[in-house]
Amino acid sequence: MRRMTTTPEPEAFLVLSCLGPDRTGLVAEVTHYLTERGANVEDSRMAVLGGEFGILLLASGPPGAIEAVERDTGALTRATGLTVQSRRTKSPESHRRAATIPCVISVDALDHEGIVRAVSRALHGAGVNIVSLETSAYEAPVTGSQLFRMEAHVDVPVGVSLAQLRKAMDAVAESENLDIEVRSLIKG
């Protein structure tokens, strides 16, 4: 008797962006929508900004499941009130760039216009890719001055030394009056 073997169906990937007024239950509703169609959350970022809740997630699943998620976004909008956009993408593994050094760049300063622009332009000029970036503004406990914090996870090409990156960040720190720390995530 001959055994039948089945090859696993290849996974498909989709980025889903959802934005709308913040309220309780949105994450539960969006993830239910995905699992009901056979898709899974691989990676996500979610935050309240002002009074709006934003969801950016990477969903995976068999091609038919991802097609159902794409096809039915109108149902998700009607059920949640969120503005929904989707875009097919490749697997995270196939996008990863070879030969990079993962680093974290932390910035602290008195808040003023142009901090993100100045840091991101310098990173771009050095050929460094921003993988994720988070910012926040807050009041200093005693003085009430508006402070700013930024943390960026970046991929530094092997051809760019950490000394070169630090030099580029030092120039931005000097011109913008920032405290910047560059830290490699590779131990050793």
Predicted regions and their residues:
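A conserved regulatory-domain signal marking ACT and ACT-like small-molecule sensing domains
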Residues: 2-188
